């Protein structure tokens, strides 16, 4: 799950950096809060793997809110909260600033070194087909649909009020 989330976030948050004016929808990403539905699939050695996931995302700068696989993940750019309501579990982690796969902001700031690892196709005015090459054998494909650009609203939607959770929740804080 961590690889799905961080791969998706790295891809999404870096889209504006890769636009270079060639795909108009990408030029708008840095100046807006972006909301969309995604489908994620993984392939290895050119063959699709059975794992296909979908969910909804809201992104603003280096903060995001993602729901999928029965989980809700929020990050304000420094802390990540991963909640499974059904299991009544919450995992709190620090966003690692040194690791590309756990810090999408690093991906943005270092995008020039990774331009050969992302392929973007604009399917329509409000959808994208993005492939992120993870290594020589493995790639992740994200199809982003129903992309909506909203005004920026700040990071309060990307944090979690842990004290509001029921006492039955198991909270693991790894910060």
Segment roles from a protein language model:
Residues 1-4:
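Positively charged n-region of N-terminal signal peptides that target proteins for export
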Residues 15-50, 62, 163-175:
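N-terminal leader/targeting segments and the immediate start of mature chains
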Residues 56-102:
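An acidic-aromatic
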């Amino acid at each position: 799950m961590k690889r799905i989330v961080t791969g998706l976030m790295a891809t999404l948050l870096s889209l504006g950096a890769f636009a270079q004016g060639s795909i108009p929808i990408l030029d708008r990403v840095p100046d807006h809060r972006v909301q969309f539905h995604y489908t994620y699939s993984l392939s290895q050695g050119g063959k699709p793997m059975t794992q296909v996931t979908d969910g909804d995302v809201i992104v603003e700068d280096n903060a995001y809110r993602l729901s999928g696989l029965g989980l809700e993940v929020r990050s304000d750019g420094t802390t990540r909260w991963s909640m499974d309501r059904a299991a009544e579990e919450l995992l709190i982690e620090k966003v690692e600033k040194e690791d590309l796969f756990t810090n999408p902001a690093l991906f943005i700031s270092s995008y020039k070194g990774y331009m050969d690892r992302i392929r973007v196709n604009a399917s329509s005015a409000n959808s994208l087909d993005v492939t992120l090459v993870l290594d020589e054998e493995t790639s992740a494909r994200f199809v982003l649909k129903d992309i909506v650009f909203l005004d920026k609203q700040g990071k309060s939607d990307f944090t979690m009020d842990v004290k509001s959770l029921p006492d039955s929740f198991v909270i693991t804080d790894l910060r």
